[in-house]
């Protein structure tokens, strides 16, 4: 059950909308007013909770028109990525809960089937909507149900190959699938690539007449040309299709309609009604929208307001917490310095330039920076190609998005043992975006790959060391680091002063006799604090910073394991096949069967959204959780409140 926020009653149109049935009774003027009230609700809420503001503001009229025309939830709406679904949530019975958006145990920021029948398909990653809606369309056809499935996909998501695989299949099946192309010329960062340039070709009437006149003149010079002209004269639209985006989608056997003003409710409703009632086969409606529509700061800087924390709604100024630099910032600064020292280093992003900290590198070395769009598979193999010719590519992608490129990592990078560095940002739980964005599987799905070295820094200084080590290593490497601030340790501004790490060598931070704490990455400092508290209770703990998930420092770990007879591993990753599993495998290989062990990490489940600290506490990987696990392993009791994260 969602928490229901306490809200003050207001006499607005929005207060009278509890389901899409209510908006179908409204007049044109009412819909205009309602759109403004929805924007007000979204801006007011997101300014407090944070969230995906600009994408949701851009599709308010489109959302109203879709629910006005289609019989949802019987007709199925599939929102690609899902970060633009706020108006959809407000209109489908969740208005009173909207103030709990992205709050712990509150409303998800993405479509959730368990949250509402109107959320037909769960999304969070890009480019899945057309495939899902096509599957729904086929299922309805097989079940003899006369309903529609509508995919709403942004032009940014159309840069991914999966979208075109679905278009190709849909054209072959020739079913009544409806695709809405929400074209705002943005994914998160501004769109890149030939497709984006193609979609942006909107010829004026004057330009069209000039092109047509010139083409007619040339074609009239031959019999073949005259035959072509006869065909073109049959339809002005056919002529225009040579020069507009429609030709691309018509090649996939879609009926193309558009471009249409995505903020003109009348035009949207009229077009959707026509397509719903007359389409025979797949149809694509090209809708032009403005990301951030209705809130000037978001319109002027849609990248900054794509996914935003709390902000001052009057000024648009983002409320930033004071504290240490983030791991992402340190990564970006170090990449900038590495690029200065080594001309063979190139950086690759998948439509997340600012999010991965690569903006400074992209500005300083534009010829060595590549934003490939939402195309993680291509990013990895593109990097492999660069590496095969002597370059040192660093690919910066969020942990949860690396899942999309598993085959490329294995087949194109690790089998040929190429020097590609995988910078795994947002490793571990990320907070309010929830299970589609948590990075709690990367240790598990990367650890089994031969040739791949995997590292995790305990702090921002060690991140620098690992990045320098990785870019100089003759083989594939991965560095996983978390979302958020570092440990406020000093970092180096000079690459030459950053030490290169010995592959597979950890460090003994504290030596004890009773128990070995073996944390990885961002769990090292909580483990050190736990060891200090345990010492106050007479328990002597060793603490190792492994640095390397693969290969493990077998000598150091086994030496301390034999000495203490007890091990607790701690990781910001799922328990299944993670770092703890690797340690157990090591003990088995070394025939150390008498060691008592306890593995701490996230459960074998999809972790819901919530503050990072809360999620760490729930999984027992804070200082307090480590202390409790140690006492349990030692079969002692004490006050559990002795330490907190």
Swiss-Prot record:
GO terms for molecular function: 1-deoxy-D-xylulose-5-phosphate synthase activity; magnesium ion binding; thiamine pyrophosphate binding. Thiamine diphosphate binds at residues 83, 124-126, 156-157, 184, 295, 376. GO terms for biological process: 1-deoxy-D-xylulose 5-phosphate biosynthetic process; isopentenyl diphosphate biosynthetic process, methylerythritol 4-phosphate pathway; terpenoid biosynthetic process; thiamine biosynthetic process. Binds 1 Mg(2+) ion per subunit. Keywords: Isoprene biosynthesis, Magnesium, Metal-binding, Thiamine biosynthesis, Thiamine pyrophosphate, Transferase. Pfam families: DXP_synthase_N, Transket_pyr, Transketolase_C. Its cofactor is Mg(2+); thiamine diphosphate. Mg(2+) binds at residues 155, 184. PROSITE patterns: TRANSKETOLASE_1, TRANSKETOLASE_2. It is an enzyme of class 2 (transferase). GO terms for cellular component: cytosol. InterPro entries: Dxylulose-5-P_synthase, THDP-binding, Transketo_C/PFOR_II, Transketolase-like_Pyr-bd, Transketolase_BS, Transketolase_C, Transketolase_CS. Pathway: Metabolic intermediate biosynthesis; 1-deoxy-D-xylulose 5-phosphate biosynthesis; 1-deoxy-D-xylulose 5-phosphate from D-glyceraldehyde 3-phosphate and pyruvate: step 1/1. It comes from the Bacteria. It catalyses: D-glyceraldehyde 3-phosphate + pyruvate + H(+) = 1-deoxy-D-xylulose 5-phosphate + CO2. The keyword Amino-acid biosynthesis does not apply. Its EC number is 2.2.1.7. Signal peptide: none annotated. NCBIfam families: dxs (TIGR00204), PRK05444.2-2 (NF003933). Homodimer. Belongs to the transketolase family. DXPS subfamily. Catalyzes the acyloin condensation reaction between C atoms 2 and 3 of pyruvate and glyceraldehyde 3-phosphate to yield 1-deoxy-D-xylulose-5-phosphate (DXP). This is 1-deoxy-D-xylulose-5-phosphate synthase. It comes from Desulfotalea psychrophila (strain LSv54 / DSM 12343). The gene is dxs.
């Amino acid at each position: 059950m969602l928490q229901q926020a306490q809200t003050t009653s207001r006499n607005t149109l929005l207060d009278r909308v509890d389901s899409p049935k209510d908006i179908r009774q409204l007049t044109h003027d009412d819909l205009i007013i309602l759109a403004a009230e929805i924007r007000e609700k979204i801006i007011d809420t997101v300014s407090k909770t944070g969230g995906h503001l600009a994408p949701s503001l851009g599709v308010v009229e489109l959302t109203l028109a879709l629910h006005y025309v289609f019989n949802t939830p019987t007709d199925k709406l599939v929102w690609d990525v899902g970060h633009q679904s706020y108006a959809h949530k407000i209109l489908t019975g969740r208005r009173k809960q909207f103030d709990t958006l992205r709050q712990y145990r509150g409303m998800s920021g993405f479509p959730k089937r368990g949250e509402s029948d109107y959320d037909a398909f769960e999304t969070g990653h890009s480019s899945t909507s057309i495939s899902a809606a096509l599957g729904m369309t086929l299922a309805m056809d097989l079940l003899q149900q006369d309903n529609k499935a509508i995919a709403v996909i942004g032009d940014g998501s159309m840069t991914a190959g999966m979208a075109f695989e679905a278009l190709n299949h849909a054209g072959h099946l020739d079913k009544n699938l409806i695709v809405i192309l929400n074209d705002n010329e943005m994914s998160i960062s501004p769109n890149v690539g030939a497709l984006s340039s193609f979609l942006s070709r909107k010829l004026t009437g004057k330009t069209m007449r000039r092109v047509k006149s010139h083409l007619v003149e040339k074609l009239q010079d031959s019999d073949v040309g005259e035959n072509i002209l006869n065909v073109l004269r049959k339809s002005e639209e056919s002529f225009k299709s040579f020069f507009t985006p429609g030709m691309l989608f018509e090649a996939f056997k879609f009926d193309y309609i558009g471009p249409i003003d995505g903020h003109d409710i009348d035009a949207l409703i009229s077009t959707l009604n026509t397509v719903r009632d007359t389409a025979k086969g797949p149809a694509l409606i090209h809708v032009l929208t403005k990301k951030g529509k209705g809130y000037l700061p978001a319109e002027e800087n849609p990248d900054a307001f794509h996914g935003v924390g709390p902000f001052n709604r009057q000024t648009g100024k983002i409320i930033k917490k004071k504290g240490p630099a983030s791991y992402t910032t340190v990564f970006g600064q170090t990449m900038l310095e590495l690029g200065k020292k080594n001309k063979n280093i190139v950086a690759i992003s998948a439509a997340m330039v600012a999010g991965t900290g690569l903006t400074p590198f992209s500005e300083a070395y534009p010829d060595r920076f590549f934003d490939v769009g939402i195309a993680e598979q291509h990013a990895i193999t593109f990097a492999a190609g660069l590496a095969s010719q002597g370059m040192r590519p660093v690919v910066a992608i969020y942990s949860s998005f690396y899942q999309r490129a598993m085959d490329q990592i294995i087949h194109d990078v690790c089998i040929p043992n190429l020097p590609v560095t995988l910078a795994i940002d947002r490793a571990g739980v990320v907070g309010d975006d929830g299970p589609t964005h948590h990075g709690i599987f990367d240790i598990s799905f990367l650890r089994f790959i031969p040739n791949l070295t995997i590292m995790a820094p305990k702090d921002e200084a060690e991140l620098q060391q690992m990045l320098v080590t990785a870019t100089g290593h003759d083989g594939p490497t991965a560095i996983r680091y978390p979302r958020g601030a570092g440990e406020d340790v000093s970092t180096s501004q000079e690459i030459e002063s950053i030490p290169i790490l010995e592959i597979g060598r950890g460090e003994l931070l504290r030596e004890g006799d009773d128990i070995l704490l073996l944390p990885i990455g961002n769990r090292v400092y909580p483990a050190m604090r736990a060891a200090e508290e345990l010492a106050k209770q007479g328990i002597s703990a060793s603490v190792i910073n492994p640095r390397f998930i693969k290969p493990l420092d077998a000598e150091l770990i086994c030496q301390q394991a034999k000495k203490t007879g007890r091990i607790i591993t701690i990781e910001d990753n799922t328990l299944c096949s993670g770092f703890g599993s690797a340690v157990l495998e090591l003990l088995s290989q070394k025939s150390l069967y008498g060691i008592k062990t306890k593995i701490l990490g996230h459960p074998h489940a999809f972790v819901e959204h919530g503050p990072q600290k809360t999620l760490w506490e729930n999984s027992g990987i804070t200082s307090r959780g480590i202390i409790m696990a140690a006492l349990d392993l030692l079969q002692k009791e004490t006050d559990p409140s002795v330490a907190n994260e």
